[in-house]
Amino acid sequence: MAWDDEDFDIPSNSKTAVSWEDEEDDDPVLESWDIDPEEEAKKKKAEQEAEAKKKAELKAKEDEAKKKRDAKKKEMEEFDGLDERTRKELLKKAELNADLNNAADLFGGLGVAEDGDEDFDINEHPREKARLAALQAARSKPVLTKDTPLEDHPLFQPTNKQEYERLRKTLGATLTALSEDSSLLYASSLAIDLIRDLTQPLSVENTRKVVSTLNVVVKDKERQERTARLKKAGGTSTGGAGKKKAKPAARPNVGGFKKDEFDDMGAFDDLDDDDFM
């Protein structure tokens, strides 16, 4: 019997393959073996930070919008408090700015509205504008302290006669005002020593001129004091006793008669006729 004539079935392995395919795997299959848990954590953290940043930006925008609304409300309240004429001027200016801005948008931003003014703002009111300018000037003004050197001030850098006179007048008015606070300290600690210090660079001739000027001042003050003293005492500035007061005029006895020594015989009333015998 030949092997070719026999019939027999050859077992197939397809069933086994199908069984492998039909099996259900509950475990998730990773797409890649290179995924690191730390990378996953970093990615998740980055997403959370991005979300928090987005929320913060949104909140900031909401706060900014609220701030603008409050500012606009305040501007309108201030605008309502203005007088009628000022309101009309500001409204006219706002309308003009709006027309210029519309024209600039129409012509593609050719700078039609660039006239140096911003959009309508309540701060453009003349009084408010002046107040802001003064405030800005005060802020930009250098702060002077006791340690600030005076020679840095432009006033202490004179170059001509007019500037020296301005310096003299300014110093004179400022320093003499200190005598009102304390005349004793002004005289002993400032005026006398300051005059001496100022005469140090002078020549002998100019120093004598200073002395002559002071002598004139002394004589003038002596005359003023003497005038005030004599005026209080009733005298004159030259030292005299002053004008004598006129005596009141005597009133004549109209209708009376002239009396003489014979008219009054009262002294002989006590004598009798026998006294003459």
UniProtKB/Swiss-Prot annotation:
Keywords: Coiled coil, Cytoplasm, Initiation factor, Protein biosynthesis
Region span, Disordered: 1-83, 223-277
Primary site of residence: cytoplasm
Biased composition (Acidic residues): 20-39, 262-277
TM region(s), chain numbering: none
Recorded GO MF terms: translation initiation factor activity
Coiled-coil region: 37-82
Subcellular location: Cytoplasm
Gene Ontology annotations of biological process type: formation of cytoplasmic translation initiation complex; maturation of SSU-rRNA from tricistronic rRNA transcript (SSU-rRNA, 5.8S rRNA, LSU-rRNA); nuclear-transcribed mRNA catabolic process, nonsense-mediated decay
Basic and acidic residues bias spans: 40-83
CC per GO annotation: eukaryotic 43S preinitiation complex; eukaryotic 48S preinitiation complex; eukaryotic translation initiation factor 3 complex
Family recorded in the similarity comment: Belongs to the eIF-3 subunit J family.
Quaternary structure (record): Component of the eukaryotic translation initiation factor 3 (eIF-3) complex.
Protein's job: Component of the eukaryotic translation initiation factor 3 (eIF-3) complex, which is involved in protein synthesis of a specialized repertoire of mRNAs and, together with other initiation factors, stimulates binding of mRNA and methionyl-tRNAi to the 40S ribosome. The eIF-3 complex specifically targets and initiates translation of a subset of mRNAs involved in cell proliferation.
Alphabetized HAMAP family for the sequence: eIF3j
Protein name as annotated: Eukaryotic translation initiation factor 3 subunit J
